[in-house]
Structures are given as C-alpha cells and as structure tokens.
Amino acid sequence: FGLAIHAHNLLLRHSDLNGLEISLKKIPLYEGAIKALNNNVKSSLNDANRNSIINYLKVDYNKINTKYLNCLFDPQTAGGFLFILDATQKRILDELDKKKINYSSIGRVTNSKKKIKVI
C-alpha cells in the first residue's frame, strides 16, 4: 500500500481524525532507499499507489524534495506499525524509550478535511 495509503486508512477508520500532516524529512529511510529515491528508482506498484491516494494529498511541490515523495507510495513499508497518539500520551513514548524501541514521530493531526498534508 505505501505509507500514504496506510495513513489515509487511519483517517477513514477514525471519524474523530480530521486530517494529517506528514513531514518527509522525518521519515526514517535506509541509505539504500535514499540512493534509490535520488536515482528515481521506484517499485513497480509506486505509480498505482500514488494514483489511488493523490486526491487525498495536499503537497506544496516547491517546498519538498519531490524525489523523496515516492517513499510515501512504496509498498515495502511497515504500515502496520503506523499509529497516532494523542499529544497527552507521552507515557507511551516514554515506555518505548524505556524498552529501547525505535520510533519516529513523522507528523501530526490537523484539520485538513480527511486529507494528508505533506511538508
């Protein structure tokens, strides 16, 4: 599916969520993935995934590295590990830290009418 589709599915399943903002710079990528993105190498399903979600994305193409945008549509993601925490739930992050479980905060909840803003 890709990260963007997993994120959109979370929006659809939770009526109390209005929208999301994802920061491309905060998405952890392996060095090999960065090389592939910089060389415009993408998976065979990348375009189909992009086309299925593009109407739900708000992207300012002048402010992002458009090559890195493809990481949102690559089906080789662990979308099952994508979750949304209320800002008051710091104790969950503290527990992850305590157990030395790596995580990355890649965005936030917004009021963007079931859209995902990519920054």
Describe every region a protein language model picked out.
Residues 1-119:
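Glycine-/charge-enriched secondary-structure boundary and capping motifs
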